[in-house]
């Protein structure tokens, strides 16, 4: 089907608060749709990467041994790969009509769990030397009971601290893939796609500025909200902005 390009209308024109893009779509509505996509993506992405990262990290830190060393080597190899290019190559092999949100997020999740695993592993190694873990062992608690009932609750601070960075990572990754044309189909509202549209038509600066501001404001809000939640969970460690 031949694509019809329109001249983007500026803001406050024809009832469009932020104007329109080259396809005649209302930018404000498109940004709101992109926000919904990012929220849905985060709700899918976060459980996947944190389930993998927490499980592997706790097992590596608690049991150690050859399995720990092997997993570390695997993580080191994968962490050296430019994950965005790998995801682009893998996504390019998938037909566009099959390239849905879940598939893209699974591809991103293949790399998103590794830094979580390392931090959880280090924290678990520290926690397993605590007196409460030794007391649980004396009372006959098994390793899985100790991990689930004693060590996992003490990892809450790490999880809360990492959450805003994980959300920012998935938002930026989706925007980058959409900008490069390897992201979600056109049926999804993508801020990266809007950014690409704006950069290709710099004579209409409100298009690119709207997408850029949406990304910056969202990432700043995620960071500050995450910091506030972290301070509420762990008030002993405060970060002050001057």
PLM features per residue range, with description:
Residues 17, 21, 25, 48-53, ...:
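Generic hydrophobic transmembrane alpha-helix motif, especially the helices
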Residues 85-89, 93, 105, 109-115, ...:
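Non-cytoplasmic
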Residues 37, 69, 76-83, 112-115, ...:
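Membrane-embedded alpha-helical bundles that form the substrate/pore pathway
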Residues 37-41, 56, 68-72, 100-106, ...:
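Short alpha-helical transmembrane interface motifs in multi-pass membrane proteins
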Residues 123-132, 228-236:
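Transmembrane helix boundary and interhelical loop/hinge segments in multi-pass membrane proteins
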Residues 25-40, 64-72, 125, 129, ...:
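Amphipathic cytosolic juxtamembrane alpha-helices at the membrane-cytosol interface
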Residues 1-54, 58-59, 66, 80, ...:
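Gly/Trp-centered helix-boundary motif
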């Amino acid at each position: 089907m031949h694509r019809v390009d329109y001249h983007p209308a500026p803001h406050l024109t024809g009832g469009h608060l932020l104007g329109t893009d080259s396809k005649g779509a209302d930018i404000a509505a498109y940004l709101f749709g992109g926000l919904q996509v990012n929220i849905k993506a985060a709700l899918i992405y976060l459980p996947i990467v944190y389930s993998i990262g927490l499980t592997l990290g706790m097992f590596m830190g608690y049991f150690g041994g050859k399995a720990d060393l092997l997993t570390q080597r695997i993580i080191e190899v994968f962490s050296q790969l430019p994950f965005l290019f790998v995801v682009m190559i893998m996504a390019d092999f998938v037909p566009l009509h099959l390239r849905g949100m879940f598939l893209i997020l699974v591809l991103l999740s293949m790399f998103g769990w590794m830094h979580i695993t390392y931090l959880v592993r280090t924290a678990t190694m520290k926690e397993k030397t605590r007196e409460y873990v030794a007391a649980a062992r004396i009372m006959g608690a098994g390793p899985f009971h100790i991990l689930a009932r004693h060590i996992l609750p003490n990892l809450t601070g790490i999880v809360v601290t990492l959450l805003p960075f994980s959300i920012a990572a998935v938002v930026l990754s989706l925007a980058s893939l959409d900008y490069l044309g390897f992201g979600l189909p056109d049926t999804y509202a993508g801020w990266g796609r809007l950014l690409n549209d704006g950069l290709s038509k710099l004579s209409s600066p409100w298009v690119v500025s709207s997408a850029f501001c949406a990304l910056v404001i969202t990432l700043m809000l995620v960071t500050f909200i995450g910091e506030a939640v972290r301070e509420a969970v762990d008030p002993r460690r405060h970060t002050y902005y001057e």
